[in-house]
């Protein structure tokens, strides 16, 4: 079980049950061997760093599906929770649908975040987009949705 640091204990009351659950019991945490895409982002102000790893396969329709996703995050409870929830939100989606997951979707899925922690949802969405961009860059492809 992950222990709360002093700052997170005082913030516990402002975190939703979903945030606390994903912080204490993060899903899909850890690295990945030979990912198809990897995105790392950080915030120099708070020091949070997130890395998301993705695996992609084509389904019977020929659509590229995000079949596996995991994360490594160094940061506060909200950073860990947003990393955890975005892996659940993106897994099994087409790459285009995963690309459209925004920071607001992440925060909503967690039942909201304190205003001072919304930057964590930005990092999670940016890390996912970075991993997807890297996947297509390595394939030397640029689907139209990447422009959005």
List PLM regions with ranges:
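C-terminal binding/interaction regions
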Residues: 2-34, 38-39, 57, 67, ...
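Short connector loops at helix/strand junctions that flank enzyme active sites
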Residues: 34, 47-49, 64-66, 81
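Short Gly/Pro-enriched turn/cap motifs at secondary-structure boundaries
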Residues: 40-45
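Short, thiol/selenol-centered motifs that function as redox-active sites or metal-ligating centers
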Residues: 46, 73-81, 120
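Immediate flanking context of iron-sulfur cluster ligation sites
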Residues: 63-74, 111
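Alpha-helical support elements that line or immediately flank enzyme active sites
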Residues: 78-93
């Amino acid at each position: 079980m992950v222990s709360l640091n002093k700052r997170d204990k005082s913030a516990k009351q402002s975190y939703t049950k979903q945030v606390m659950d994903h912080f204490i019991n993060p899903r899909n945490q850890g690295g990945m061997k030979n990912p198809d895409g990897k995105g790392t982002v950080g915030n120099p102000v708070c020091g949070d760093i997130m890395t998301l790893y993705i695996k992609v396969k084509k389904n019977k329709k020929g659509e590229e599906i995000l079949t596996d996703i995991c994360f490594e995050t160094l940061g506060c409870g909200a950073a860990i929770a947003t990393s955890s929830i975005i892996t659940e939100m993106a897994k099994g989606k087409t790459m285009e649908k995963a690309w459209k997951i925004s920071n607001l979707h992440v925060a909503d899925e967690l039942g909201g975040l304190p205003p001072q922690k919304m930057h964590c949802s930005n990092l999670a969405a940016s890390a996912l987009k970075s991993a997807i961009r890297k996947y297509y860059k390595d394939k030397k492809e640029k689907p139209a949705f990447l422009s959005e």
